[in-house]
Amino acid sequence: MAPSFDHLPDPEEDEYDEEELDISDLRERFEVQLEQGLDTFVVIDGLPEVNEDTKPKLIKFLLRKLDSVGQTKKDSIHMPIGPDGKSFKFAFVEYSSPAEAIAACKALDGVPLDKKHTLRVNKLTDIDRYGREGRIDENYTPPKIEEFTEKEHLRSWLADPAGRGRDQFVMYKDDRVQVFWNNEKDAPESIVDRQHWTESFVQWSPQGTFLTSMHQQGVQLWGGPSWTRQKRFAHPFVNLVDFSPGEKYLTTWSNRPISIGEEGHPALSVDDDGKNYVIWDIETGLPLRSFANLDLPSNSVDAEGNPVKRKIQWPAFKWSSDDKYVARLTQGSSISVYELPRMNLLDKTSIKIDGVMDFDWAPATPHREGVKNYEQLFCYWTPEIGSNPAKVGLMSIPSKEVVRTLNLFSVTDAKLHWQSDASYLCVKVDRHSKSKKSLATSLEIFRVKEKGVPVEVVDSIKDTVINFAWEPKGDRFVIITTAEVVAATAVPPKTSVSFFCPEKVKGNGVGNFKHIRTYDKKNSNAIYWSPKGRFVIVATVHSQQSFDMEFYDMDFEGEKPESDKDLTANLQLMNTADHYGVTDIDWDPTGRFVATSASIWKHTMENGYHLYDFKGEQLREEPVEKFKQWLWRPRPPTLLSKEEQKQIRKNLREYSKVFDQEDADRGASADLAVVEHRRRLLDEWLAWRANIEEDVQAEREDAGLPRDPLEPLKSKMASGDEGQAIEIEEIVEEIVEETEEIIS
């Protein structure tokens, strides 16, 4: 029978009632927030209790706070009074726009009104939305406490399971990220190998606790023996990250401003919309504050006459050594110092410094002579402005005391170089001649820990310094100079490498800095000190023509030249090496090994890595297809006191005997393992051959043939006439002595 409307049920006879359908969960989930007339209202709680007589005074006092974030007036504040003539300790306030109401909630919530009262500010629409009937359960329900699960030890890698104190490194190639134990000459031992672990690059945290992976959605931190995810920071399209020295905080930056849609964001708020930088608390995973990019002043223009945008300075936010402050430079005008973790501006104002070009925190808390309370220290420099000279300054934080200033003249540029212990600050000053056609460099060295911070000038340098590096935890330095104008050319300029150290003085003082030696006619452009000092590599990187590496020892134990008797160094070239297309050179954190690598990010020729010991002897050479990145895993600072470290150095020869024996045993066991493996392979082959021969002999017997195919020939030779044997005689001549005479 064909279907028709006659077969449809009568709506009036339907068994269900629409009013009985419960769709509250759907309404709550898909509720659309419409523009309301109450969006300009806020509710202020936490006010003191007043009566009709004192109410106007409170409103007048409150207006001072309210007007700091928007426009409101006395008539826009409604403070209800109860039947007993006293207020209910809250008030309704109307602003001129919803944006001002939102700003009031952010700026005034939690602000103390006086010693006994703290303001709590919320939007009126939020109270209606979250506080309506049914949203809050009147009956207390105890929170569900999850069962305790022990977390992995994030520094377990420091206890090498092999007991050899090995270091780890991460390698990024193609789309794979691998972490290995370094086994010196032997192949590295793989720990973890994952594909698509990151989308752009990987980065260790400063103390090696976390491995950072970069994604379009944000940043993730990994660690522990099982390499599980420890934290995630949802900053869309993130490009760069920077950790604080103590791994407490993290800065993320994206060239795309943050965009918060109507659906919101899991970690960021509407206030973060349009920002580029976010500073996070690593322990909680929460954002502390966000910032927008600053437009850097440009000194050049393009072909159309428009100013050329300068590249961002990274890191834009620089950390103090104790993780208590982070500062940002507004080039040409000020330095803003923020206190952590609240991220409030120190003393509620930026430090105004006219013309300031750059600044840098001391990498350690300097213990200055004659100062009882040690504070953090940063240095800055300003160029010549009008008739005012250029200036270098040291400022103490949080007191903002200017510890030392130095006036400079004819300055073209300056670079700030802190020594790792903050004992010294070297300001590399490029000065121009009166005609401004030539440049020369001087080094202004601040002795930060000495009383009054004296400054020593090294002005014996005739050429322009293109690279400078302090010895870590030491007082020696290396510079690279050139007489040519450095430009982006395929042929690197000719350079000179110079070494400096203090001269010997009586007592514990440090003498004046003296020149040790200069090596000319080089192509070197990079300096890499061992993290433990003493050894240094001078190399040529990112070059298409030259890729030399020279390994120097600053404390050579051999004979010292007479000219260096009064110096605190004995310089010796230990070894030279070359690595075609080398782009990166990295010391391991113990200063025992050096990895050199050629990354596909720079070129596609012979990508891979080489491994050397500190003396420059090559241990491994590993070509790696689509090689991108190599990074040693950093180590945290030692827990040993200075006395314990001194005791270890004193007994180092005794410890070395044990380590040498372990190395010898390991080498012998490795050789024994190779011999055993080869013997096992030979035995297997001999057994296989015996089985095959047995099978062949059985097949010959079945075919009626002798077991040995050579048996007929052997029988014939045995029955032959022995008289017909042929005797063969061989004569061999041997030269005993050879002389040559010339006959005239």
UniProtKB/Swiss-Prot annotation:
Ranges for domain RRM: 40-126
GO CC list: cytoplasmic stress granule; eukaryotic 43S preinitiation complex; eukaryotic 48S preinitiation complex; eukaryotic translation initiation factor 3 complex; eukaryotic translation initiation factor 3 complex, eIF3e; eukaryotic translation initiation factor 3 complex, eIF3m; multi-eIF complex
Residue stretches of biased makeup (Basic and acidic residues): 699-714
WD repeat copies, ranges: 193-232, 234-290, 307-348, 577-622
Subcellular location: Cytoplasm
Biased segments, Acidic residues type: 11-20
One Pfam family from the record: RRM_1
Assigned keywords, A-Z: Cytoplasm, Initiation factor, Protein biosynthesis, Repeat, RNA-binding, WD repeat
GO molecular function annotation: identical protein binding; RNA binding; translation initiation factor activity; translation initiation factor binding
Main location: cytoplasm
GO biological process, one term: translational initiation
Renumbered residue ranges of the record's region Disordered: 1-20, 699-722
SUPFAM superfamilies (alphabetical): DPP6 N-terminal domain-like, RNA-binding domain, RBD
Similarity-based family: Belongs to the eIF-3 subunit B family.
Subunit structure: Component of the eukaryotic translation initiation factor 3 (eIF-3) complex.
Biological role: RNA-binding component of the eukaryotic translation initiation factor 3 (eIF-3) complex, which is involved in protein synthesis of a specialized repertoire of mRNAs and, together with other initiation factors, stimulates binding of mRNA and methionyl-tRNAi to the 40S ribosome. The eIF-3 complex specifically targets and initiates translation of a subset of mRNAs involved in cell proliferation.
Annotated protein name in UniProt: Eukaryotic translation initiation factor 3 subunit B
Underlying gene: prt1
